[in-house]
């Protein structure tokens, strides 16, 4: 109780340089782009639900969202160091966030974060296979 827990934390998205360049080139001309769903969980039923049945999943990515990220990323990277030791769970197969960069930043921002790396886990840790969930629940408890 009272712990700070970060699951696949977003410091910056994967391929951030490309995304920023695309945003600068396209945002004056388009309001959104079609969304591409990625394989961000090893649970095929969850992935099917996201793609086909979840009414909260947008089919387009607003360029304003990428614009918000252009403000978020520098803000997080400039944030002052905190006297916290969060628990961090990160999948090494996560292709949504730039997790290597994120862990480097988190190590700079926090006092000795406790990090669990799961080699085969992807971004949607809460919707990963039961075995992966068990491993990080054991780490968190």
What are the residue ranges of the model-derived segments?
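Alpha/beta-hydrolase-fold enzymes
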Residues: 1-64
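Conserved beta-strand scaffold positions in the cores of enzyme catalytic domains, especially
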Residues: 4, 88, 115-116
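Active-site nucleophile elbow and catalytic-triad environment of alpha/beta-hydrolase enzymes
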Residues: 60-79, 84
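Short beta-strand/loop motif that positions the catalytic acidic residue
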Residues: 82, 88-94
């Amino acid at each position: 109780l009272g712990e700070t827990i970060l699951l696949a934390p977003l410091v910056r998205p994967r391929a951030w340089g490309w995304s920023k360049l695309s945003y600068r080139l396209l945002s004056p001309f388009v309001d959104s782009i079609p969304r591409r769903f990625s394989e961000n969980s090893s649970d095929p039923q969850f992935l099917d639900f996201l793609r086909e049945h979840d009414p909260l999943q947008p089919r387009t990515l607003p360029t304003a969202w990428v614009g918000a990220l252009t403000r978020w990323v520098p803000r997080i990277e400039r944030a002052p160091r905190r006297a916290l030791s969060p628990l961090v769970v990160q999948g090494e197969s996560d292709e949504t966030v730039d997790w290597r960069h994120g862990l480097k930043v988190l190590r700079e921002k926090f006092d000795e974060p406790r990090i669990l790396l799961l080699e085969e886990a992807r971004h949607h840790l809460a919707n990963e296979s039961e075995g992966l969930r068990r491993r990080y629940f054991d780490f968190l408890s």
